[in-house]
Every structure is written in structure tokens, then in C-alpha cells.
């Protein structure tokens, strides 16, 4: 029992209570001893003292039990407080976990939206690049067609110009050759005759 009291921290209160009870018992014994000096009452006094001592022991045991019960009640209260603190800590931890999960869900949603926006921007850029590529190709085709048409027109003009120059040169050569042939065909006498006929015609006109 003493070990149980010591283990639960009740030994000092129990010893203090026992000391008080023994002090009271000693005081009572002294009072009985001083008041009962006659031999006839010695046997009764011894029985009374023995009975009183048992009462004191019972009282001490009862007091110890009471002290132990009070201490245990305090221990239960402390345990209850500790349990409440543990429950509070667990509740706060659960709330913190819930808040963290909520934050994680929010950030995950924001990250997903950001990824979708990035994908959309990338798709728009790629589409814009394809449209720009098609536009450049179309402009290049138009430019090439214009250059081809311009080259064709220029070539046609050059051909026509060359043909005209060839015709002019051919005509000039033809005239020159005709004159040369005519000169060679007309003789000196024919020239004199032609001049004489021409002069006669002029005179007749006057």
C-alpha cells in the first residue's frame, strides 16, 4: 500500500496525516495516564488504549484512502484535461489538414487552368504561324505570277520590236537592192532618152 501511495505521489500527504493522528493519540494517552493513576482502572485503560489505537489506525487508513481518492480524482481531472488537449490538438491538426487539402485543390485547379491557357496560347501561336506561312506562300505565288506575266509581256514586246526592226531592215535592204538592180538595168542611152522625154513633157505643159 505504501508503494502505491509513493507511486501515485500520496506518501507525503499520508505520512503527514498519520503524524497528526499519532500526535492526537499521544496527547489523549498522556491525558488518560495523568488522570488514571489508580491501579483498579489500569486494565480498563489498557483496553481503551488498544481500542483507541485501532481506531487511530483505521482513521489513518481511512484518511489515506481519502487522500488517495482525492489525488486520483485530481489525476483523472488532469487526464481528462490532457485528453481534451489531445482532442483539441487532433481537431486542430484535422482542420489544418483539411485547409491544406483545400489549398492544394485550389492550387491544382489554378495550375490546371494555367496549363490550359498555355496550351491555348501555344495552339493560337501555332495556328497564327500556319496562317502567316500560308499568307507568305500566297503572296510569293502572286509575286511570282506577276513576275512571270511581266517577263512574258517584256519578252513579247522584245520579240515584236525585233520583228519590226527585222521588217524595217528587210524593207530597207529590199529598196536598196531594187535601186541597185534598177541602176544596173538602165543604160546610158536609156537615161538620155528618159531625160529628153521628160524635158519634152515639161515644155508641152508650158
UniProtKB/Swiss-Prot annotation:
Keywords: ATP synthesis, Cell inner membrane, Cell membrane, CF(0), Hydrogen ion transport, Ion transport, Membrane, Transmembrane, Transmembrane helix, Transport. It is found in: Cell inner membrane. The keyword Transport applies. GO terms for molecular function: proton-transporting ATP synthase activity, rotational mechanism. It is a single-pass membrane protein. F-type ATPases have 2 components, F(1) - the catalytic core - and F(0) - the membrane proton channel. F(1) has five subunits: alpha(3), beta(3), gamma(1), delta(1), epsilon(1). F(0) has three main subunits: a(1), b(2) and c(10-14). The alpha and beta chains form an alternating ring which encloses part of the gamma chain. F(1) is attached to F(0) by a central stalk formed by the gamma and epsilon chains, while a peripheral stalk is formed by the delta and b chains. GO terms for cellular component: plasma membrane; proton-transporting ATP synthase complex. This is ATP synthase subunit b. F(1)F(0) ATP synthase produces ATP from ADP in the presence of a proton or sodium gradient. F-type ATPases consist of two structural domains, F(1) containing the extramembraneous catalytic core and F(0) containing the membrane proton channel, linked together by a central stalk and a peripheral stalk. During catalysis, ATP synthesis in the catalytic domain of F(1) is coupled via a rotary mechanism of the central stalk subunits to proton translocation. The keyword Transmembrane helix applies. Belongs to the ATPase B chain family. The chain crosses the membrane at residues 10-30.
Amino acid at each position: 500500500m505504501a508503494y502505491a501511495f509513493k507511486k501515485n505521489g500520496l506518501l507525503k500527504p499520508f505520512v503527514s496525516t498519520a503524524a497528526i493522528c499519532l500526535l492526537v493519540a499521544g496527547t489523549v494517552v498522556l491525558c488518560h495516564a495523568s488522570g488514571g493513576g489508580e491501579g483498579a482502572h489500569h486494565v480498563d485503560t489498557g483496553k481503551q488504549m488498544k481500542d483507541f489505537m485501532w481506531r487511530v489506525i483505521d482513521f489513518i487508513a481511512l484518511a489515506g484512502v481519502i487522500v488517495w481518492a482525492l489525488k486520483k480524482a485530481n489525476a483523472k481531472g488532469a487526464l481528462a484535461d490532457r485528453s481534451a488537449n489531445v482532442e483539441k490538438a487532433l481537431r486542430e491538426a484535422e482542420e489544418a489538414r483539411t485547409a491544406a487539402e483545400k489549398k492544394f485543390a485550389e492550387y491544382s485547379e489554378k495550375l490546371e487552368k494555367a496549363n490550359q491557357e498555355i496550351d491555348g496560347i501555344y495552339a493560337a501561336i501555332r495556328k497564327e504561324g500556319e496562317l502567316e506561312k500560308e499568307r507568305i506562300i500566297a503572296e510569293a505565288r502572286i509575286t511570282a505570277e506577276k513576275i512571270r506575266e511581266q517577263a512574258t509581256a517584256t519578252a513579247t514586246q522584245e520579240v515584236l520590236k525585233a520583228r519590226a526592226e527585222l521588217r524595217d531592215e528587210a524593207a530597207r535592204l529590199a529598196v536598196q537592192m531594187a535601186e541597185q538592180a534598177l541602176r544596173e538595168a538602165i543604160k546610158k542611152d536609156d537615161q538620155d532618152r528618159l531625160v529628153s522625154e521628160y524635158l519634152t513633157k515639161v515644155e508641152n505643159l508650158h
